[in-house]
Amino acid sequence: MSVAEESGLSVSSNVAQCLVDERIPVIDISGYLSGDPQAVEQFAVDLRAIQEDLGFYCIVNHGVDQSLIDSAFDQIAELFALPEDVKMNHKVDFHHQGFIPNKAMILRWSKITKNEKKDLNEAWAFMRERTADDPKVVANIRHRGLNQWPEALPEFRKTLLNYQETMADLATRMLPAYALALDLPADYFDDKFSTPEYYNRCAWYPPVDVEEGQFSLSPHSDHSSMTYLPLMDVPGLQVMSPTGKWIEVEPLRGAIVVNTGEFFNRWTNGRFIATPHRVVPPTKDRYALTFFYNCNDETVADPFPSCIAPGETPKSEPMSFHDFFVTYMDGNYIYRTAEMDQD
């Protein structure tokens, strides 16, 4: 029996109307986070409706201090304002950690279009923080190396680590809602996210002229289990609706956009969608603190019991998160190839 059937709750009117109108729902999760039983059940019902339809929503009253988000935005603005030679001293490495120059990315994993133009943004990739004696660092496991921190910005590392830890805590607290939405026990994900991996992609999208078929960030679906994106006051993010319409995400201060990615889509056997989205050139500088939240590297995406019928063949082969992540990254980034130097 589903959580909706057990609770007798239906999708809230606000969410239902947003899905009909193809608008991004905004959900107050304060009741859910406080543990109010009815709020927990209602959020699970709404979450399932969203994830089977539009795949994107915004949360407010999420407990993340706005001053922390503002400080993180200030720090990444300073990061990308550094001289080019300073940034290039931290150029992205074998582990996809560090500075990613403009035009170093073509999102080829898109299911809706053939992206052929290089994206017009700069980024800096930070993975989960590790020390030199971490077993994965010692073993030189892909994408599990040491982060490259900008020495020129003394407050940057402290601010960003605080941001990452805070976002990871929020994402972990959200897991029971996803479990309940999938008719699983609330603690189902505890052992699968016991050592979660995360990828914090800080990005700068400047106002630029583009060629036909070129974007600040091409149409794509994320790799992640879940993605969390605090909004700033500059629009640019667009989400594809079920009917193929591009919906602009309103830059609502204090809100965090949430969506699921390709790995979770595999895990749910296609039930929870990985919605295509893109970034169009903004009218002024736009920055992003995208936080991709993922399960343990060793966790394998076998369909959940509620997402596959007895005897049904899974839509995808079982795959560990780490194997999936390496494949996704290598398929989208051209920073290690000669193609990067060809405009």
Task: Go through each PLM region and give its residues.
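Peripheral, non-catalytic segments flanking oxidoreductase cores
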Residues: 1-343
